[in-house]
Regions:
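Glycine-enriched alpha-helix->loop->beta-strand junction motifs that scaffold or abut catalytic
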Residues: 64-66, 105-108, 126-132, 158-162
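Active-site glycine-rich loop that binds ribose-phosphate moieties when present
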Residues: 89-98
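Short, surface-exposed alpha-helical recognition segments that flank or form part
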Residues: 94, 111, 179
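Substrate-binding cleft of carbohydrate-active enzyme catalytic domains
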Residues: 98-112, 116-123, 150-158
């Protein structure tokens, strides 16, 4: 974390004419008024927490405002999504449950993308604040363990959360390596129907996917809104 954090600070300094950190909503409004893009520091995978609450406090002080509970492996918070039903059913570990209340108090977002189904439902049960799935799609449309079921979408919407649609083809279309706007729209419409229009977001994962994309970067995203 420390190495990546230093890289982050250097990027902010090198691009300070167009980029500024945001710790809260007021910062976002201030940056927008100044004509700058807001950068919100996030952490994907709770491994760096190492089961220590003081690490969570440290991350918050450094500006982290969102943590994805897991990536592809078990950690001190809980378990990842898995093709193994026994793993998928596992809920959060005691430290994972403890972090929910503290993150709620601090105003840190919990991200459930990559989390086991059991862990997801623990978040629903115990979180008093909205949470998000930063880069996930709909399991009803593409049966992948990384995607959310209709019940999950409904629960997330009820909590006031957001689903960032992932542009990776394996989460949009089974058996295809192509990502097209029509597939993205299909998942957008399903999320709208099951979670509500306020739950719609984009979680492209451009830096982590190898799909054949109809557009290659953020410059092409207005085409989705025009479709």
């Amino acid at each position: 974390f420390q190495f990546v954090y230093q890289v982050y600070l250097k990027e902010l300094e090198a691009n300070q004419d167009v980029l500024a950190p945001a710790m809260n909503y007021e910062d976002i409004l201030r940056n927008k008024a100044a004509g700058k893009i807001s950068s919100v520091l996030t952490v994907e995978d709770g491994v760096p927490l190492d089961g220590k609450m003081e690490r969570l406090e440290e991350f918050y002080q450094k500006g982290v405002r969102l943590i994805s509970y897991t990536w592809n492996y078990e950690n001190s918070l809980g378990y990842p999504n898995s093709k193994d039903p026994a793993v998928m059913e596992k809920g959060l570990k005691p430290f994972g449950l403890e972090c929910i209340s503290r993150m709620n108090e601090l105003g840190m977002l919990i991200d459930v993308s990559h989390l086991s189904d059991g862990g997801f439902w623990d978040i629903v049960k115990h979180s008093k604040k909205p949470f998000i799935a930063s880069h996930s799609c709909c399991r009803a449309l593409c049966n992948h363990t990384r995607n959310l079921t209709d019940d999950m979408l409904h629960a997330l919407g009820e909590k006031g959360g957001v689903v960032g649609i992932n542009f990776a083809s394996q989460f949009l279309n089974e058996g295809s390596n192509d990502t097209d706007i029509a597939s993205i729209l299909r998942h957008m419409q399903h999320i709208r129907d099951k979670a509500g229009i306020d739950a719609l977001g984009f979680g492209s994962d451009f830096d982590g996917i190898t799909s054949n994309l109809e557009f290659r970067d953020y410059a092409g995203m207005p085409a989705i809104l025009d479709a």
